[in-house]
């Protein structure tokens, strides 16, 4: 690998690599903790030297704080001494008796694994920087949220929303190609079941387990099996506009419909039913309305289900699955916008005290594990092509964030066999984007948010990437043309 490309690869996947590879993560955290403790020792000595009157109580406190820092420094130094820079970054270091002794003294009663890496992870979790500062009475003051910080929060929220949107589209694309069934459901909370819902923190988890096990039974499998290969879901919370009442919109993607599922329009003179009764009764806290999602060439048509009509008797408009996917994502965008609203505003609209208790909780978008992250393997691609894919923009694919994450994961695996010292030699400097933007605002009279942030990140247009990278996107079927909702026609129904 060329030196320039190698350096760019490490910079591109640094956060992924430190999260994935235990040896590298520990080396970085040990170095950061050593710097922190040295700085705290300096501040403690400086504070002591500035004391005009040193009584016994103050001196005893200083001795206690100094002893705490010395214990932590001893563990950090011992762990640093055990790190082998010539070993690979995915190496697992065996336990050292002295490290175990120091750990048990600092973290009494805390369990740890069989490697030094797991012991260090437990220590870092038990003693974060904030807790150490609290013990030393050196808590950092909360920073004031200026215009830059508020804008960055909005940008992060927008990025999360776009990422979830792309994951939903990709998951529905994959499910459509596999011939799965889509069911759209709305979960509500009945007044007489609010207390039971409030008392069960795992109500939603239990509901999705019930649906997953129903799919397993329909396939003749044990309910103890994992249903991740035959059932996927997305659940988006929403608060009603008039009374702020909590409910959820759910998209079920199933390989096999639960037992008892049949065409609701079979034998009916007017085919205007779409509810699937086999999904009802699984949510014990209110009402549900499970509806078959019909679109061009869907699994229901291949199963022989009749095409539904509207109230006037006309065949319902048939759209491609892409249009259905984009429709579902609007709920994700709406939930993201509602998160910005204050909880007190919702409670003012709510008359029921039990519902007001629900509104105090923060409900997030729930989904199956690794929803929408599946793409064709990138193991055959070169590091240069992977680096290009890790920098693509919307021009190349509407699923650009999914492609970038998969490319970075593959790059992270590719560098896993390299020695630790080789990676640390090209360790990128971690810069604060907040500080960088603030400096730009001072230097630039006519400051532009988008152009400034774009200048700090490397992105490639479709014309900037190689033919091999472009061919991967085409073969994966995730080009803008592939994911564009085309002209609506009536297809696939009887």
Curated annotation (Swiss-Prot):
Nuclease is among the record's keywords: yes
GO biological-process terms attached to the record: DNA replication; viral DNA genome replication
Function: The A protein is a specific endonuclease that cleaves the viral strand of supertwisted, closed circular DNA at a unique site in the A gene. The A protein also causes relaxation of supertwisted DNA and forms a complex with viral DNA that has a discontinuity in gene A of the viral strand.
InterPro entries per UniProt: Replication_gene_A-like (IPR008766)
Active site per UniProt: 327, 331
Keyword Cell membrane on entry: no
Domain of life from the UniProt record: Viruses
MF term (GO), any: zinc ion binding
Start-end of unnamed zinc fingers: 230-252
Keywords assigned by UniProt, alphabetized: DNA replication, DNA-binding, Endonuclease, Hydrolase, Metal-binding, Nuclease, Viral DNA replication, Zinc, Zinc-finger
Remarks, miscellaneous: Phi KhT, a host-range mutant of phi K, can grow on E.coli C and B, besides K12, and is more thermosensitive than the parental phage phi K.
Protein name as it appears in the record: A protein
